[in-house]
Amino acid sequence: MRASKLSFLLSVLCAAALTIGLCFCIITSFFVPADTLRLALACVCIALLCSALLLLPKSWIWLLGAVLLLAGGIYYLKDAVWESFSTLLYAISTQYVDAFPGLQVLSLTAAPADGDAALILLLLSIPYALLCSWTVLRGERLVYLLGAVLPPLVLCLVILQTPPAAWAILLLSLIHI
């Protein structure tokens, strides 16, 4: 199936909205320190790149090359990635300790509260952008995307202590899909 310009634009729009929404859901639920403007722009660029890679002929070769470049970049920036991951983990565990007494705050570095979690959030959003672009451009089922997005959403909803009615609405909306 050859994708049209409209499906490419729809893919970029959906992937950008999904990745930005995912990142900001985590940021606002757990008060994660992150540079939000840079993160939003990077999510749009990632959505554009993932959609463009899936349009190319033999896209799996290009995706493999992109994964290898990404792995090299992560290895090169491993200290920054580790600090960003530690900041995210510290922010999430701090919110869970405040909400549920008896848990311990997890800290992987000396001062994780001073860091910026934008890098790890961007790395976490790449598979979601790729899956969303693949779903839109290839005409795949939406169930795979919903199954992938549900764990971070549940993680954020648990900390917000969502009332049971919201869970019922969420489950009923999933049944109709």
Where are these regions (language model features)?
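Linear, non-domain "peripheral" regions
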Residues: 1-175
